[in-house]
Amino acid sequence: MGFSDLTSDAGLKQLNDFLLDKSFIEGYEPSQADAVVFKAVGVAPDTAKYPNGARWYKQIATYDLATLPGTAKEVSAYGPEGAAAAEEDEIDLFGSDEEEDPEAERIKAERVAEYNKKKAAKPKAVHKSLVTLDVKPWDDETPMDELEKAVRSIQMDGLVWGLSKLVPVGFGVNKFQINLVVEDDKVSLEALQEELEGFEDYVQSTDIAAMSKL
């Protein structure tokens, strides 16, 4: 299906609904998909009518669109798709009572066992969050390249570092802002912040600027 006219109310509502549980058009980081849709929207959506679209538009506006990764496609290639047909193999768990015989019962039992085996083999859902983290240095003399190396040196099971940038905060000081994806059951954000603040030569404090479930 994809996005339609993103300058119309219907198109903006479609975008707003699509972004209800997403931070970006595709994946966990900004890409050319966001750049294409951003250009198609043209102007910032009304915050009152389209809060999700407005949030996304404001965030993408902070990036240099030409540098975002990926390959640009037509705007209709992005967005909601038709509901996929269920891929579950359907089996008849309820046979007719009219033709009960040992062979039919054996086949039915095999089908039930196979069905239960498939259900048990399905992997459990992994809950993830997309987090934008602000890392604040001590002053304008803090070496930000070394600060970034220190941040990215932290490795945890269930933690994936993403894109980062420097954001001016005044008086020549920049804060380091970075996106990350965490598996909720494996990574404690509080523990991560404590570890980051352990780099006392570079880091004054950390804050969670934004967070959304994936």
From Swiss-Prot:
The family database entries (Gene3D superfamilies) matched by this protein are listed as: 1.20.1050.130, 3.30.70.60
GO cellular component assignments: cytosol; eukaryotic translation elongation factor 1 complex
Q: Tell me a GO biological process for this protein.
A: translational elongation
Signal peptide feature range: none
Return the SMART domains for the record. EF-1_beta_acid, EF1_GNE
Q: Which SUPFAM superfamilies match?
A: eEF-1beta-like (SSF54984), GST C-terminal domain-like (SSF47616)
One Pfam assignment: EF1_GNE
What keywords are assigned to this protein? Answer: Elongation factor, Protein biosynthesis
User: MF terms per GO, please?
Assistant: guanyl-nucleotide exchange factor activity; translation elongation factor activity
Summarize the subunit comment. EF-1 is composed of 4 subunits: alpha, beta, delta, and gamma.
Q: According to its UniProt record, which protein family does this protein belong to?
A: Belongs to the EF-1-beta/EF-1-delta family.
Q: What task does this protein carry out?
A: EF-1-beta and EF-1-delta stimulate the exchange of GDP bound to EF-1-alpha to GTP.
Tell me what this protein is called.
Elongation factor 1-beta
Which organism is this protein's natural source? Answer: Schizosaccharomyces pombe (strain 972 / ATCC 24843)
Lineage, top ranks: Eukaryota, Fungi, Dikarya, Ascomycota, Taphrinomycotina
